[in-house]
Amino acid sequence: MNILFVLGTKAQYIKTIPMINHAIANNLNVTVVDLKQHPEKAKLLINKIKGDYVYKEYIKNQYDLGTYLNLISWFLKLLIKILFTRDKNFKNNYSVVHGDTLSTLVGALLIKKNKGRLVLLEAGLGFPGMFKHFPESFVRYYVAKFSDYLITNGDDQINQLDEWNVKGKVIEISRNTIYDSLDLVNLENDNSKNKVVISIHRTENINSKDN
């Protein structure tokens, strides 16, 4: 059985590598398609993948994209390639995208254009409004609408998918994938250290006093 992971950002690598390793351990034929949004950081994370898999660069880029101009240029180059080229590797195969980034959107377009089975990992995240947290909210909604399989956790996320009237199959898991990702950094179970890690990378977390 073949499964493809279409990734571009450092967060996508961090949160999908445990799933990739699990797929490899279960003798699936894994292909990682790199969209190169954060190639410098991705290079440091790829060595966390254990076992045999196929790695494909979908576009050439050596540097992490950190400006709007660079992101727009990269996005347009990807769109042109997707529109005018075909990739038979996706056809009828499970193809995973993660989250709500531009890489998620581009990955979904790539998969659907080539008749793959689109799997959205971490589906049904909060939706404050289509343009309130743009483009994240836009990506969350439209990728969910076109996904064949939606992997999610929690009643809030499932209710959100119900509100969107998604057509794909909703698969509930027990917890967010970030818990599995903690194993990648080999955290020690040491209660003597008064330290805590807090993730506030989402726009709505940064802007919300409640969060």
Predicted features, each with a name:
Residues 4-6, 13-24, 61-166:
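Active-site and donor-binding regions of nucleotide-sugar-utilizing enzymes
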